[in-house]
């Protein structure tokens, strides 16, 4: 991390260490990462810069507002042309497949200009498969289509060979020779049932296009191990909120304006040496493997803490926290510890990534809670703030997005918005 920070610094790109630590740990999870922040806060620049520093490739795919299905992301098979119409995203996956030793960071820029669940939900479900020896397989079109093209090609070759044999023209070795030989040309037109408007040249061209289509775009592709998917979102009146399904599976990494950074402190962090100008060479495994999340264990302090918080606060608030979320938290904490041993910072980051983004509800709704009486959701949220302050009572976060500060901001904003709680507002 120190080398990456110094390399970027020497190239005029300034990021505090905590951002690089957090991003690297999230990259290693193999989960979907969504960078959230104002336009110009450095979201896509982080992806490009990080990729450059680690000897990788970054590909930025702009999302369009009219994306409504997986076809907009992955393309579709055109049965009339017998050809697969690809997309920049799919092309990027194939490029990564051809270069398995290079890490690829594919960014869906302005991801929420369209509803993410419309075009990305199926793909996101595939990413849930976490067997490193059996990577997810992305089905692009039916195997029957490629079989049909292969069968047609075999039939054509068979008819050509039999026609040459019947006319004693076995000396003809290529398609040009067939076209130049009037007798063979005419017989093939008859065998194929061509009308006067059809030509062997056009038919040959169509066959080449169909064959090229199935060779260039096979019916399926296994998700490349060297690819990480990252989304970048802005929140304004032109964008859509992320659905619960997306929030449950993704990690949200929030960005403040770079103008709020402590530039002097960042300069003090950077450790320049004679090798700082060199890119690092990583193995693909250094970016994490798609292995199962750690098991849920009630003897683990983090698991016990999350169960307690869920029962007392999250469930009454309607904030969905299941085993997946807790296991993702265990996974992130383990990976983050490689770069930073601060457990409090890891828990702070987890709250910012996985819990606070789910906080959207009407705070004025009243709930009867056993042994606590009738409370509004806003009351429960304030109690949660007190609990977090207690957890962090001996800890001061000077690194990045502070969960306590964020929670206070959520509560303050709701007060001026008729108690409507919305993390994204």
What does each of the following model-derived ranges do?
Residues 265-425:
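Alpha-helical lid/collar subdomain of P-loop NTPases
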Residues 1-284:
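AAA+ P-loop NTPase catalytic core and its hallmark functional loops
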